[in-house]
Amino acid sequence: MAQDKFDVGGMTCAACQAHVDRAVSKLDGVESVAVNLLAGSMMVDYDPAQVSPDDICTAVDRAGYSASPISTGTDAVQSGSAQARSGAAHMESPTKKLEATASAMRTRLIISIIFLIPLFYIGMGHMLGWPLPSVFTDHTHSMTLALTEFVLLIPIVYVNDAYFINGFKSLVHGAPTMDALIAVGATASIAWSLYAMFIMADQLATGQVHEAMMTSMDNLYFESAGTILSLVTVGKYLETRSKSKTGGAIEALIDLAPKTATVVADDGTETVVDVDSILPGQVLRVRPGESIPVDGVVLEGASAVDESALTGESIPVEKTAGDTVNAATVNRTGSFTFRATRVGADTSLAKIIQLVEDANATKAPIARLADKVAGVFVPVVFVISAVTFAVWMALTGSVNEALTSAVAVLVISCPCALGLATPVAIMVGTGKGAEMGILFKSAEALENLRNVGTVVLDKTGTVTRGKPAVTDIVVATRADGSPAMSEKALLKLAAALERSSEHPLAEAIMAECEARGIVARMVEDFAAVPGRGVTAREGQNLIAAGNVRLMDEMGAKVPVGLAEQFAAEGKTPLFFAKNGELVGTIAVADEVKETSAAAIAALRKLGVDVRMLTGDNRVTAEAIARRVELTSEQVIADVLPADKERHVRELQDAGGKVAMVGDGINDSPALARADVGLAIGTGADIAKEGADVVLMRSDLMDVARAIELSRATIRNIKQDLFWALFYNGIGIPLAAGVFFPLTGWQLSPMFGAAAMSLSSVCVVTNALRLRTFKPSVAVK
């Protein structure tokens, strides 16, 4: 299967989105389609053997819209060599696209208002008692009034011709949209007004001057058509302006990419170049206050780097030779050089932007209701409008009243509010997540996370740091009460033994020795004893490091219960012997992260059951569990890496949604099996296989924050869907005149157009509230 993203043009409402979806879904070989009205894009999963991107574009064209594949290439070939492009710097900003659209709408709106003011004044002045020139009030000049209104309407229709073009085109294709509602409503008003002008001409020709004036007052709807078009444009303008704010997070990420960089040549000369021209392997210099242009590894120098833009972590991270740095992070203090490793679309920044945009291109399950309604909404509205006209004609015999209600039904109906409810909230929610260092790979993951009832935490690297460290150094005491050796001597002995070992415990001990400036001595006859430890000879001395079994074999007596005491504290003891005598013990533990206990408490407050899964034995696992306030029943111990997926499946079979949190190193199958997989502490490696959500920081608190953000986003979507359905459920009957017998009031099409415009604006404005979302557990 292949997946491609397409730009789709011409979509204006949820009905358009539904028609494009339906047209592409019908193609053989298309597996799934996700059309995003807000972004004007479409993601398609398809079988290349059965259908091509050209076939997909043709299907969209036949439906009355335009489509083109979005190029995902990251390299441009020039003069026979690949030149890396800056993925982030050259991504088209969705915000700027929307701002350009809003600017064009603003021009249309200004022109519309300039001509609408005199049109409305002339057309409604006689009803509202406004003073009018005699040329418009004298019975002999009724045609002057009608012609003036018609002339003033022409520019309004001209600048808003898109509603008519798109609307009637959708009718021709048998897939009417919101533009069709506006076009038919405005056209009906204009057509009836033109018909009234012919009646007036006949009346004037036969000397019925008074009747002609009455016809002009009662049957001209030019100002109604002009007001409808202008108010819809007001709503579209405000809506587009609001939508441009929803992409603020992506816009901010794109703006982080610097445009230039300083390249250091082999002879030491420095040259400022365009970031586009940087190639992997080049050496660059970054000075204090500058943004790092690409990903790389520090060569010389040291500094504190602000990585908050990528991870949400506000505390600068110290960087020295050998450390990695990422594009768009900011150098705060010292100057350093680094070698570029990933450039253009391969940088962590570009991948984050792409991931957020891809998430916005997907569809949340909650959107299915809106899609189903939108698919039949416009045809149903046309039927209701026709029935309204017929009923009013039958009851009153008045074309004016029948036309007023029928047009009001058309223009008050708003499928846009339904279509915008989900994508706007998803865009703001995923953008907010990116600001917090929480990356959702799909809208479905964002929705599913809110329903998670159980969170399974892989112990190593999630609850703990994932890097064992020395916790205790205990020198053995001889029978006479004297120490077997000094602490420094014990560490020298440990360094000599462990320097050749590849065991994780050995790495922790060597790190401790290096930190204390202890240099490992050379040993002879080094041997690893499987399942026990290591032995070696240092001069005439036989030395060993290992567990109780190895000590017993060496004749070194370990105090009864000492190993169990360390295990009960979640520590792994390593015993050291010299010539058959126990000389000391060094305990190593994978330390619990500072925020783990608080994060688990926060998850409990959210009503989530927490389980810890580990390959450690139960004694060690329960010792860790006690430190984070988990009970023994919440611990799943002695689990082989291959069995993690099975345990997740068993929890799912027991009922409820399950989320799995791991570092993605040996738990990818479990992450994929879970209803939502969260990869934690990935840093720049955001493309973890199997993970639905990527947590940039190694902070378990982000799991609780992600759940809170998910719940807030879906709550916002439900609010928008409710109000969109409620608005149409009340507005359409009101426009049809259902409440006329009770109120004696008939809704004007002008008020209907205003209400329709405001409904979409309200939906977008409500979604924008997510930009101020703050989890109960504040981000550091």
Per-region residue spans from a language model:
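Flexible metal-binding regulatory segments at protein termini and peripheral loops
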Residues: 1-146, 156, 243, 269-272, ...
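Conserved cytosolic catalytic loops of P-type ATPases
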Residues: 28-46, 50, 220-222, 251-346, ...
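Juxtamembrane coupling segments of multi-pass membrane pumps/enzymes
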Residues: 73, 200, 204, 209-211, ...
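Soluble-to-membrane junctions at the N-terminal ends of transmembrane alpha-helices
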Residues: 91-114, 166-189, 353-385, 402, ...
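Transmembrane helix-loop-helix hairpins at the membrane interface
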Residues: 99-260, 372, 473, 744
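Membrane-embedded alpha-helical bundles of multi-pass transporters
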Residues: 128-143, 172, 176, 191, ...
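Conserved ATP-binding TGD loop and adjacent catalytic N/P-domain core of P-type ATPases
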Residues: 281, 288, 362, 480-483, ...
